[in-house]
């Protein structure tokens, strides 16, 4: 990640856990490509640029400075660079955040974008916001949990159809936020219309489209809808012939999208690959919302098995159509039971699971539900550790980033922030806290202890540690192991 002040996220975290090394990730790659101008020299930009003389450039993504999925400054630089390279008509389709940043901050982000687009209009570029909606309700679903979310985005962005119509985005956000149970995350879809009531920016044949998020997981589904001619997840009504590129390639195995502006990090020689080819049979399991993390991201942004005879991946369907605070226990016990079964079967030397509760429910702002979620995760951990005790195994318990351990917004002194009514403001984003790690179990060799000479160990140190626990030396270029054996 760019700096120590950037919040970790699940994708970067699982990349580090699985790869054993730190790779420049989405935000850093995009920053570099924009700063050097390399982005504009690549095949992806050249591809979309062919639409500039006669058609519209559409930009779809999260309007935020959270740095988890996207960044506003990168969007502004991309708009600037495209306008300087021939884009005469630009439409931005915004998705409001309120999850990785403060709820309500979308108004300020929209004002910043509107002001910049107004400056471009003064220079003769027809640049406007065309549509919008909240990230959890419009476009940004993941792992095929709810295609209805993507359809709402498609209807607004491509067809120019939405239940709410406004003359500008700031007015839209302010008005819609006043509706009951509405927040930045769950803002209903809207389109911007002209003085005649016509939408200003539907996507049509010949247009160029860029999804500008750098994080992959919540762009894959809209990328499929934009790129695949053979598509049956919802009725697209029409499928415009466009030039589409992602900010990055979101799925290396699917080659999706086929065109992209920034080359992805090349993550090779992951711990999963090493262990599989050295005879370590592996079982990985989570529910839908984190299944990709214990497989695709763990394996270096690679879909599928290294060796299907040596691996088994199990996905438990997540609840769909509800927010996770409604069912905060999620599928923790089901995941644990699958893990327990895999352990007791003695078919596998490594069993890897992700319990999503504290992250997914922590994002909802409900402290009461998050307490229930954490208790469910605790129960699940006990089920797994009891099985490990039975077979004489070893456990490693850690996390990919912080979230539920602090759900209060704080000032620089650590004091809680209050709203205008004197109530504590709830934090829905990840945190900058270090994550814990616990290693134990009856299979742990006598004398194994944490090293004292790795005071700043992080997620990338876990891979070498796990390889050591399996009886292997880690590759020399991996981040060092966290453990050592001390003779008693």
From Swiss-Prot:
CDD domains: iPGM. Its cofactor is Mn(2+). Pathway: Carbohydrate degradation; glycolysis; pyruvate from D-glyceraldehyde 3-phosphate: step 3/5. Signal peptide: none annotated. One of its GO terms (biological process) is glucose catabolic process. Pfam families: iPGM_N, Metalloenzyme. Substrate binds at residues 69, 99-100, 135, 142, 215-218, 290. One of its GO terms (molecular function) is manganese ion binding. Mn(2+) 1 binds at residues 359, 363, 430. Its main location: cytoplasm. It catalyses: (2R)-2-phosphoglycerate = (2R)-3-phosphoglycerate. Monomer. This is 2,3-bisphosphoglycerate-independent phosphoglycerate mutase. It comes from Prunus dulcis (Almond).
């Amino acid at each position: 990640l760019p700096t120590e002040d950037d919040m970790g996220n699940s994708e970067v975290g699982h990349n580090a856990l699985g790869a054993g090394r730190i790779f420049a990730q989405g935000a850093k790659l995009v920053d570099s490509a924009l700063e050097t101008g390399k982005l504009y020299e690549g095949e992806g930009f050249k591809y979309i640029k062919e639409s500039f003389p006669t058609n519209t450039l559409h930009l779809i993504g999260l309007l935020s400075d959270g740095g988890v999925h996207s960044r506003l400054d990168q969007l502004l630089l991309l708009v600037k660079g495209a306008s300087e390279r021939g884009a005469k008509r630009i439409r931005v389709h915004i998705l409001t955040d309120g999850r990785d940043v403060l709820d309500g901050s979308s108004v300020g982000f929209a004002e910043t974008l509107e002001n910049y687009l107004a400056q471009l209009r003064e220079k003769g570029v027809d640049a406007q916001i065309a549509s919008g909606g909240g990230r959890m309700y419009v476009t940004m679903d993941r792992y095929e949990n709810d295609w209805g979310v993507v359809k709402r985005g498609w209807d607004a962005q491509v067809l120019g159809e939405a239940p709410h119509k406004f003359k500008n985005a700031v007015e839209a956000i302010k008005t819609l936020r006043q509706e009951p149970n509405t927040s930045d995350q769950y803002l209903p879809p809207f389109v911007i219309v002209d003085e005649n009531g016509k939408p200003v920016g539907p996507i049509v044949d010949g247009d160029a489209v860029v999804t500008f998020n750098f994080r992959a997981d919540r762009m894959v589904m809209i990328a499929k809808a934009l790129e695949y001619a053979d598509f049956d997840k919802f009725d697209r009504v029409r499928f415009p012939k466009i030039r589409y590129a992602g900010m990055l390639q979101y799925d290396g195995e699917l080659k999706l999208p086929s065109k992209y502006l920034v080359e992805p990090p090349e993550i090779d020689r992951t711990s999963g690959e090493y262990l599989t080819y050295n005879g370590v049979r592996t079982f990985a399991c989570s529910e839908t919302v984190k299944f990709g993390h214990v497989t695709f991201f763990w394996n270096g942004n690679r879909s599928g098995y290294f060796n299907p005879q040596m691996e088994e991946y199990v996905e438990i369907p997540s609840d769909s159509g509800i927010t996770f605070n409604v069912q905060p226990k999620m599928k923790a016990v089901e995941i644990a039971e699958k893990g327990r079964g895999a352990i007791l079967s003695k078919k596998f030397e490594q069993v890897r699971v992700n319990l999503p509760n504290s992250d997914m429910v922590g994002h909802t702002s409900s402290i009461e539900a998050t307490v229930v979620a954490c208790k469910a995760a605790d129960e699940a951990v006990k089920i797994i550790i009891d099985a490990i005790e039975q077979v004489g195994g070893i456990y490693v318990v850690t996390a990919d980033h912080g979230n539920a351990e602090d759900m209060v917004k704080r000032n620089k002194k650590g004091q809680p922030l209050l709203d205008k009514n004197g109530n504590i403001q709830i934090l829905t984003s990840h945190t900058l806290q270090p994550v814990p790690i616990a290693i134990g179990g009856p299979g742990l060799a006598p004398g194994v202890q944490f090293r004292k000479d790795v005071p700043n160990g992080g997620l990338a140190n876990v891979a070498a540690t796990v390889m050591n626990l399996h009886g292997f030396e880690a590759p020399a270029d991996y981040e060092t192991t966290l453990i050592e054996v001390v003779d008693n």
